[in-house]
Amino acid sequence: MTKKILLNAFLFIAILLASALMLLPAMLDKSMNPVSEHAPFVVSVEAQELHGSLIVGDWHADSALWNRDLKKAYDYGHADIPRLQAGNVALQMFTTVTKSPSGQNYDSNESGANDNITALAIVQRWPIKTWSSLFERAMYQANKIKDLEKRDPENFMLIESQYDLGIFLLKRVNNPKMVGGLIGTEGSHALDGNLENIERLYENSFRMMSLQHF
C-alpha cells in the first residue's frame, strides 16, 4: 500500500513538473515581453503614403531567443512575420542573445555574474550543448531563422550577400509583403573567447557582429 502511494505521488510530481516545463517558457515570454495596449494611433494619409513608399529596416530583434513560431502573429514580444508585414518592415536583423548577467544595468556589470540565459535555455528545453556554450546558443537561434525561410519562403527570405539583397528587392516588387532577414550577434560573447569562431559564424549565415553588448 505504501509503495502504491509513493508511486502515485511520484507520478503526480512528475506530471506537475512536466506541465510546468511546458507552460513556463510562454509564461516567462509574456511577462518579460508585454505589448502595451493603447488606442489606435492617428496617422495622416500623407504619412501612410510616405511610410508605404520606404524600404524600412530594423536592426535589432531578439525574437529567436524565445520559443515562438515567427510565422504566426503574437500579442506579445517584439516581432513576428505578420507584424513586420503589417508595419511595412522590409528588412529585419535577428540578433542572437547568448549572455545576460544577473543584475544587468547601465553602470557596471561583473563578468563573473550568474548568467540569465543559461536558466532560460534549460527551461525552454534547448539542446544540452547550449547550456554551457555561448557559440552553440548563437547557432541554435540562427538555425531557427534559417528554418523559418524553409517553412515560409513566400513571406521570408534570408539575406547573406549583396546578390541576395538584389534578388530580395526584385521579389518584393511582386510581393510587397515579403520580409528579408539577416542574422547577427548581440555582443561578441558568441565567440566563446575563440577568434576562429568568427569564420564559423560567417559560414553559418551570420552577417553582423556587435562588438559589445553591456
Model-identified regions with their sequence ranges:
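N-terminal hydrophobic targeting/anchoring segments and the immediately downstream early-domain regions
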Residues: 2-214
